[in-house]
Amino acid sequence: VTLSPTASNNIRVRLGDDGGWHDRRDHNELLAWESHVAQASEPPHIVVYAHGGLVSEAVGNSIIDTIEQRLFANAPNICHVSFLNRTGLFETLDQLSNSRAFTWLARAVTSVLSALQDASALPEHDGSPEVREDASQVAVKRARELHGRLQSRSLTDSIVDEVANKLLQLPEPQVAAALLEVARAVQRRAAARVVVKGRVRRDSASPVPASRNEFDAYLVEEVVRRFQLPPVSAWREMKRRVHAAFAPPHPGAAIVASVQRVRHIQPDARVSLIGHSLGGIWVEAYLACAGETGNDLHVDTVALLAPANSLASFRRVHRWQGTVWTQALLMGLTDAEEREEIDELSPLLGTLYPRTLLYLISNALEDQPAFPILGMQKFWEAPVPHDVHDLFQQVSWVPGIVDGQVIEQYSHGGFSTNPQVLAWLASRLVDS
């Protein structure tokens, strides 16, 4: 296979449903790319990029177009390989969105949120312990009445009954947020939404602020987790496909082998890995696969944008494989932005879920709630092992100023196409 001059430095490897090759032509193009890069007159800079998983193939191609135009257009020595997650989570969920289970999810959440409006109409109070106790009793009474109404409604099915039962068994923080200090303000979006203004800790004499939409998010997470609905199985399948791709002779393992053969011919070649969201797990799998070969594992730059990796698994890969890198960079959203994301997950949960995909992964899609995710600021602010901090030369949370540059990034999904993020990343690739 002979690649066109414009495509010779940049190729896209598409994955099949099983993590293998979508088409043998992709494998042939990879081998042609390898031959081209190995014969370069100057030591090449090989960049392997993996996009996030919640996109269609068309959107994936569009993202890679932007990466090539903004990140690599002015760097002729960069030779770029992109993983194109051909059958992404987007398509999987789109196919499932009309299924009975998915309809149940939307119905359960909207029914409970709508009914909760009655419980939200508590009178304002001055925050004194005596008044708080009265409000608590009223809230519990309203919740029990709500439970009875839900059970008797003709439109209520068994799943909604179970969700209502779950309401009466909430852990203390959620009880405080959703019942002890239920706000009067009720905000309506596409689905009825209860806005929780604040909560009161039992050991505190004054109100302690709670996150906006805290109860909305908690309810969706509990329904998804409890009933193992399509998003859970889809997320597990996406991760399985990532790891399957790095089993020989599949695409991930083939790319690792190609890069190592190029470095044998071009010992001064540089290698950098970039991953966004699910792409962070691709980077981790690449490092693990390369480590198993026993060859030189030096990497120039590892850049993770809002990565969905387990914090523990990324630590393990680095510890076991002994990877050496010049710089590791992590950029993610501030926790305040993660908690205020509306409509990010369509068609996953549409307007029902008011937070980012990483919050849903951590609280509902992984095996245990509050599962530590590498790209979430909240887990870096909590006590974390020192070796986690030592893995990265720079950790940045946006929106904010990074290396003197203003970066206005407000959504989980837009990192790979944000000109400010890409300009910052380009400068770091050059400086390394």
Predicted segments — roles?
Residues G60-I64, E284, F314-R316:
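Conserved strand-to-helix beginnings and helix N-cap segments that scaffold or border functional pockets
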Residues A75-L89:
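Conserved alpha/beta-hydrolase
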Residues L54-G60:
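Short substrate-entry loop that stabilizes the transition state in hydrolases
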Residues V37-H45:
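Proline/glycine-enriched tight loop/beta-turn segments at coil->beta junctions
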Residues S62-I78:
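Short amphipathic alpha-helix adjacent to the substrate-entry channel of hydrolases
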Residues L273-G275, G279, V283:
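Gly/Ala-rich beta-loop-alpha elbow adjacent to hydrolase catalytic centers
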Residues T2-H27, T87-E145, R149-S154, Q169, ...:
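Lipolytic serine-hydrolase domain surface
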Residues P44-G52:
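Short beta-strand element of the alpha/beta-hydrolase
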